Amino acid sequence: METQAPIIAFLYDFDKTLCTTDMEDYAFIPSLGYTPAEFWGRANAFGWENRMDGLLAYMYTMIQECAAQNIKLDRAFLNHCGESIQLFPGVREWFARINAFGESLGVQVEHYVISSGLREIIEGSGIAQEFREIYACEFYYNENGDACWPKLDVNFTNKTQFVYRINKGILDVSRDKELNDSMPDDSKRVPFTNMIYMGDGLSDVPCMKMMRVYGGQAIAVYQASNRQGRTGGFHFPGRLPGGHGAGPHRPGHPPENDHHRPAAGGQQPPAPQHRRRCASQSGGAVLNTEYLNDRKTGAENAPVFSVFPGKSLYLQYRFC
């Protein structure tokens, strides 16, 4: 009987991990006539005022704003918005190259998205076919094809559910009973030790912690402009000055001064305290999304996701 090759699973956040900013910022929000700060300000304020999950708040705001402006919010429209996504250099080529590298080592490489963004927008990004499964927020569509209800919400510790699904090979989100049934470790499709998680924001920390606890690997992605990050720090919230900049962002990617959002009852929520945390405390390493050191020359001139000297894979990262 033929023995199946070991499976190595790459698990990715999407926004600011594979692409340069929140996916809604490229085309969806401009189609409403808003700036990203204006839209996220509205969505975040609505969530604060109603003590609402932040992702459900932004999905509700999407439905309401499109209805107010007579924009048909259907799957085709959101797929079209995904065509404007700007991926980091090398991302499109990454999948074929790492797959080939894995094959040369006798392992099967699989890719999964676990994102607080929208599945429908990711489907239009041009790389959706690279993923075995995409776990992201998703709408339910009525008989007219209009988005009318959140079908799936992927947020913070909820993200860990999908790590377990990949671990057990139970990818269908409607199969709750099987997911919670006991399963011997030797029957699990992808061991935690064969998982590599990449993410950049607050919503990724629980999955990073899982990787650390169960023997997988986690890589914290940061921008080159975040000087503190380059020295090994992983910062919350907003990754401090030099990160994403000021103004409201989607929940899970809070900016440095996100404390101006109104809280329930009209009160201002307290200003966040800048908490330093080493990436290794959250389960892994720090990966620069813009430059990697060339091992031979030491020059910082190689874009991320494309540093493959010969047949050796160099995901250049450093532990705290």
Language model features by range: what are they?
Residues 288-319:
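Positively charged N-terminal leader segments that act as targeting/secretion signals
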Residues 62-64, 160, 166-168, 295, ...:
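Generic alpha-helical secondary structure signal
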Residues 25-27, 212, 308, 313:
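Hydrophobic alpha-helical membrane context
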Residues 23, 124, 206, 305, ...:
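Residue-level recognition of conserved structural "scaffold" positions that shape functional pockets
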Residues 2-143:
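Alpha-helical substrate-recognition element adjacent to the catalytic core
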